[in-house]
Swiss-Prot record:
Keywords: Amino-acid biosynthesis, Cytoplasm, Histidine biosynthesis, Isomerase. SUPFAM superfamilies: Ribulose-phoshate binding barrel. One of its GO terms (cellular component) is cytoplasm. Transmembrane segments: none annotated. It is an enzyme of class 5 (isomerase). Its EC number is 5.3.1.16. Coiled coil: none annotated. Pathway: Amino-acid biosynthesis; L-histidine biosynthesis; L-histidine from 5-phospho-alpha-D-ribose 1-diphosphate: step 4/9. Belongs to the HisA/HisF family. It comes from Methylobacterium sp. (strain 4-46). PANTHER family: 1-(5-PHOSPHORIBOSYL)-5-[(5-PHOSPHORIBOSYLAMINO)METHYLIDENEAMINO] IMIDAZOLE-4-CARBOXAMIDE ISOMERASE (PTHR43090:SF2). One of its GO terms (biological process) is L-tryptophan biosynthetic process. This is 1-(5-phosphoribosyl)-5-[(5-phosphoribosylamino)methylideneamino] imidazole-4-carboxamide isomerase.
Length: 253
């Protein structure tokens, strides 16, 4: 059984903390003008990791919210994984040098697999691949375009690359609170040996309990965004459920 991690999401647009609906920048809902304060709140609530995305960077292909990310890194001691606009080695080096614990490579994983392999070789345990899918096909450039590559195909390309994790997002469910796409996420987790983190659609504590069912043992965790901001998920309740499940498994081992 993989240790399950629940990642609170901070999506950055123009320096603010927002949530999108199915990746549509025109449907950005602002939840906080102070991402660093939001990060500190998540850390105080007991979360062990943060998931941060530079949305403007994902569209631009280069970091666009550096000041906000810097402020988040200064505000918390827990590890931060960061994605959005990471398409060059100097960007990887820059963020890791500033204290980001893990960088997520998305578009470049489709366009330039050798870049991912080289980054994983140079920075073991620090590189994740973001696989964002629409109808099973991988989307790129801030989800603005869809490739011909399937999620399973892309995951298998990095099977022996030393990638630390895959973050799998079902775009159709992202920000609409329809529940995680467990079947598709599990299919990917079964196709690769890389730890897979589920994203997109997590809506309630029921989704957390579903994640903790025995058939989801391959999954390494999930990312929660809108449900957390909307108050649909109580952080203490969610984290306590994960602790109880892991204690029960430990007792039964």
């Amino acid at each position: 059984m993989t240790h399950v991690i629940l990642f609170p999401a901070i999506d950055l647009k123009e320096g603010r903390c927002v949530r999108l609906v199915q990746g549509d920048m025109a449907q950005a809902i602002v939840f906080s003008d102070d991402p660093a304060a939001q990060a500190a709140t998540f850390a105080a609530q007991g979360f062990s990791w943060l998931h941060v995305v530079d949305l403007d960077g994902a569209f631009a292909g280069a970091p666009m919210n550096a000041a906000a990310v810097d402020a988040i890194l200064a505000a918390v001691a827990i590890p931060v994984q960061l994605g959005g606009g990471i398409r060059e080695m100097r960007t990887v080096e820059g963020w890791l040098g500033k204290g980001v614990s893990r960088v997520i490579i998305g578009t470049a994983a489709v366009r330039d697999p050798a870049f991912v392999r080289e980054a994983a070789r140079r920075f073991p345990g620090k590189i994740a691949v973001g696989i964002d899918a629409k109808d099973g096909k991988v989307a790129v450039e801030g989800w603005a375009k869809t490739s011909t590559v399937t999620a399973d195909e892309l995951g298998r390309r990095f099977e022996d690359a030393g990638v630390a994790a895959i973050i799998y997002t079902d775009i159709a469910r992202d920000g609409v609170l329809k529940g995680l796409n467990i079947p598709m996420t599990l299919a990917l987790a079964q196709a690769v040996s890389i730890p897979v983190i589920a994203s997109g659609g997590l809506a309630s504590i029921a989704d957390i309990h579903r994640l903790l069912e025995p058939d989801c043992a391959l999954l390494a965790g999930a990312i929660t965004g809108r449900a957390l901001y909307d108050g649909r998920i109580d952080p203490r309740e969610a984290l306590a459920a994960i602790r109880r499940a892991e204690q029960a498994r430990g007792a039964g081992a």
